[in-house]
Amino acid sequence: MIKLVLLVAAIAIFGTGFITVIINQFTSAKNIIMDLYNSDTWLIWLFGRMAVLFSHPLMLTISSLYIVGFIVSKTLYS
């Protein structure tokens, strides 16, 4: 029971930060995509822009959320 309370508290504390970071990164990713569409020579810049998009912190955040979810599920169901 105590472990569950600590887990919920940790998720609440880190969750608010995660949500803010994810919103900022979605906005940044959206700006990159909009730049792609608004560019006249977008075929020339496509590979450079896609490289920026795929090295985007959003990808890192998604993978770290999977890791956090895995740890949480292991803690709850062990």
UniProtKB/Swiss-Prot annotation:
Bilayer disposition of the protein: Single-pass type I membrane protein
Protein name per Swiss-Prot or TrEMBL: Putative capsid protein ORF9
Main location: virion
General function of this protein: May self assemble to form a helical capsid wrapping up the viral genomic DNA. The virion assembly and budding take place at the host inner membrane.
Sorted UniProt keywords: Capsid protein, Helical capsid protein, Host membrane, Membrane, Signal, Transmembrane, Transmembrane helix, Virion
A Gene Ontology term for the protein's cellular component: host cell membrane
Segments passing through the bilayer: 52-72
